[in-house]
Amino acid sequence: MLIKTDRWLRGDDIPASEITPQHLFDQRRRLLAAAALGAAGAALSPWAARRAFAASPAPAWLAAKPNPAYATVEKPTPFDEVTTYNNFYEFGTDKSDPARYAGTLRPHPWQVSVEGLVKAPKTYDLDDLMKMAPMEERIYRLRCVEGWSMVIPWVGFPLAELIRRVEPQGSARYIQFISLADKRQMPGVSSPVLDWPYSEGLRMDEAMHPLVLLTFGLYGQVLPNQNGAPVRVIVPWKYGFKSAKSIVRIRFVDKQPPTSWNIAAPNEYGFYSNVNPSVDHPRWSQATERRIGEDKGGFGGLFAPKRKTLMFNGYDQVASLYTGMDLRKFF
């Protein structure tokens, strides 16, 4: 499990080669300037876009120090797999669509409006938001409800830093994340597969948990467009669709907010959506998972050996958030 202290390694004990494959470690402080991935990026093939992405030096703010409390002995998923096997329906429903089409997204300039039941509402420019707290690198597991998983080094800071800054009112019980929905930049928004814009939410105590990361980068680089640039949240004990991408609004509310997949299919996607091997999705068993990149065949993990899925994705320190709850009913 990832959470048990005796299963973790301290950062000083982990060779860089174990955290990042060597050929990728050499690229860790590189990125593509946002302007280079403007409208012209849509014409790039996925391999060309990846090469362009590694072309420029990373900004100073991205030199995040690895947090040894969030290291793991598990091997991270290769960068190429992380950036080409994605669910991001704003760019299409195939796993390859985000890498192929997300070049149209313009992550700069960018603003995030924090509003609702807070004493200090504010619209943050991306640069100001990134300076709010020290960046750190955390290696988290990501588990998709479709039965596949990855291990990814993310860069960001705890969402709780932002929450404390805006001073929630006592009546604020939930947080809603609203993603960009711009047909000019996101061709998938024209599809009726979901009600746009994409929306997700957390209970306030969930959002304040130190595991929740407001995320700006991965693998030592700025977030690629297809991975939710320029800012997203990572909630590692929940299925991946709970970790909203390309966020433009964060709302503090007193009632459980509507969430996109729950609206689309409430019998399949609950509000909580905690990783739970005992509660199957109607179309996918949740008892096991395939680790992307382990089949070595380039088939998206289709032939990777199955491994047992852990309750809360292995992050059992969140169990106290759900004391007394029937997690089959509140799935």
From Swiss-Prot:
Cofactor(s) demanded: Mo-molybdopterin
Places the protein is found: Periplasm
Cofactor notes: Binds 1 Mo-molybdopterin (Mo-MPT) cofactor per subunit.
Enzyme class: oxidoreductase
InterPro entries: MsrP, OxRdtase_Mopterin-bd_dom, OxRdtase_Mopterin-bd_sf, TAT_signal
First and last residue of the signal peptide: 1-54
Keywords attached to this entry: Metal-binding, Molybdenum, Oxidoreductase, Periplasm, Signal
Reactions mediated catalytically: L-methionyl-[protein] + a quinone + H2O = L-methionyl-(S)-S-oxide-[protein] + a quinol; L-methionyl-[protein] + a quinone + H2O = L-methionyl-(R)-S-oxide-[protein] + a quinol
One of the GO biological process terms: protein repair
Residues binding Mo-molybdopterin: 86, 89-90, 144, 179, 227, 232, 243-245
Post-translational modification: Predicted to be exported by the Tat system. The position of the signal peptide cleavage has not been experimentally proven.
GO CC terms of this entry: periplasmic space
Pfam family, one: Oxidored_molyb
EC numbers on record: 1.8.5.-
One Gene Ontology molecular-function label: molybdopterin cofactor binding
Subunit structure and binding partners: Heterodimer of a catalytic subunit (MsrP) and a heme-binding subunit (MsrQ).
NCBIfam families: PRK05363.1
Role, per record: Part of the MsrPQ system that repairs oxidized periplasmic proteins containing methionine sulfoxide residues (Met-O), using respiratory chain electrons. Thus protects these proteins from oxidative-stress damage caused by reactive species of oxygen and chlorine generated by the host defense mechanisms. MsrPQ is essential for the maintenance of envelope integrity under bleach stress, rescuing a wide series of structurally unrelated periplasmic proteins from methionine oxidation.
Family from the record: Belongs to the MsrP family.
Protein name (record): Protein-methionine-sulfoxide reductase catalytic subunit MsrP
